[in-house]
Regions:
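Beta-strand-rich binding-surface signature
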Residues: 5, 16, 84
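Gly-rich Lys/Arg/Thr-decorated short loops/hinges at beta-loop-alpha junctions or inter-strand turns
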Residues: 13-16, 109-110
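Short hydrophobic/aromatic beta-strand immediately N-terminal to the Walker A/P-loop
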Residues: 17-18, 46
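Conserved lysine of the Walker
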Residues: 27
Length: 208
């Protein structure tokens, strides 16, 4: 309808919204327009973009006669523009998916979530909690997987057996299972997620 702009009031954006449709019906374009509108109004937007379709927000679009005639027919006063974006990635600059690395320190991740990631059973999870508790009591900050592996190896060694006794004991068999699970996670690339600095969700609300 010429002269009428279809827009969504900003106060309505705190409600749930579903964008659905068949392939090629404009779902990605709809998300892009929503993000553009929010960015233009000073609101930060977090988009999970697996295929990279939305990275075009960083570049101003190229004009063409066909585009201008279409927008004119729809009553739109179109002008190309770019928007500030920041690419987040699990891999970071040293991987095939460059971007600001999203990381978490082992200490912040915690033993319960890590036990789930490692598919540990209840006994193994409890042992991992004891290991975390000992490290915390010693003031040891577990940053990445090698840090955790070093602590487990120490506690199950001859030098660390006295320390191990103070936390109730962790069998070498259980420690071996945890160490093998850590190695498996690392071989699958999971080690890239752990490191410093840890990701702060407050950064998602940062405005330039």
């Amino acid at each position: 309808m010429p002269g009428v702009s279809a827009k969504m009031p900003l106060p309505m954006f705190n409600r749930h919204l579903l964008v659905a449709g068949a392939t090629g019906t404009g779902k990605t374009r709809t998300l892009q327009l929503l993000a553009e509108g929010l960015s233009a109004n000073g609101s930060s937007v977090l988009l999970c973009d697996v295929k990279g379709d939305l990275t075009g927000l960083a570049e101003a679009g190229a004009s063409s006669d066909k585009l201008l005639s279409r927008t004119a027919a729809n009553g739109q006063d179109w002008a190309s523009s770019s928007f500030p974006i920041e690419l987040l990635s699990l891999g970071g600059a040293n991987s095939q998916f460059p971007g600001v690395p999203v990381r978490a320190q082992i200490s912040d991740f915690g033993p319960i979530l890590l036990a789930r990631a490692l598919s540990l059973n209840t006994t193994q999870e409890q042992a991992l909690q004891l290991i975390f508790a000992w490290a915390d009591g010693q003031g040891l900050e577990l940053i990445d997987l090698p840090d955790l592996r070093a602590v487990i190896s120490f506690l199950t060694s001859d030098e660390g057996k006295d320390e191990l006794a103070t936390i109730g004991g962790v069998s070498k068999a259980t420690a071996g299972v945890i160490l093998r699970a850590l190695t498996a996670l690392e071989s699958q690339g999971g080690g890239q997620f752990f490191g410093a600095p840890g990701f702060d969700t407050a950064d998602l609300m940062r405005m330039d």
